[in-house]
Amino acid sequence: MELTTSHIQFIKEHATDDLTRLLLSAAKYPGMDIPFLVDQIAVRRQIREKLPSWFENGQLVFPAKIAAEQCSSEQTAAYKQELIGESWTICDLTGGLGIDSYFLSRKAKQLTYIERFPVYCEAAKHNFSVLEANNITIINADAAQVVDTLPAVSYTHLT
């Protein structure tokens, strides 16, 4: 799951458009996945205040509107980051959009992101790469089924 240059441009050009009309006019944009792009625009509208730095980064992709609704705000994630140690290894059992994982990884030594939905993992892989969060391992699994197989960590995050 990635945004191409044409996707990014489309999102910028149509950021304030009526999304229902945009969906209904999908035939005007051959080769563009209009439902996907409309979802990206809708999520960006949702996160403008909640995740300002992610809103500003046009290369980030969002797997689902509900992920944006359920995620921590940047302010909350930054607070959580203050509570951990620099040498810590962390496991985020409910990866979701990856906001907490990203902020915690900026201070932690290593972070494991676990998420059961493949599309969330694809988006997280892309976003963490864009954000240069290179100390995150992504596992696509139900946390309850893999938690006993994971190595010991300093902190297990579950929200």
Regions found by a protein language model. Name each.
Residues 119:
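Conserved Rossmann-like nucleotide-cofactor binding loop
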Residues 156-159:
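Conserved small/polar residues in nucleotide/adenosyl-binding loops
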Residues 1-86, 123-150:
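S-adenosyl-L-methionine
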Residues 97-108:
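Conserved SAM-binding loop of SAM-dependent methyltransferases across substrates and taxa
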Residues 88-94:
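Conserved class I S-adenosyl-L-methionine
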Residues 110-115:
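Conserved SAM-binding motif I beta-strand of class I
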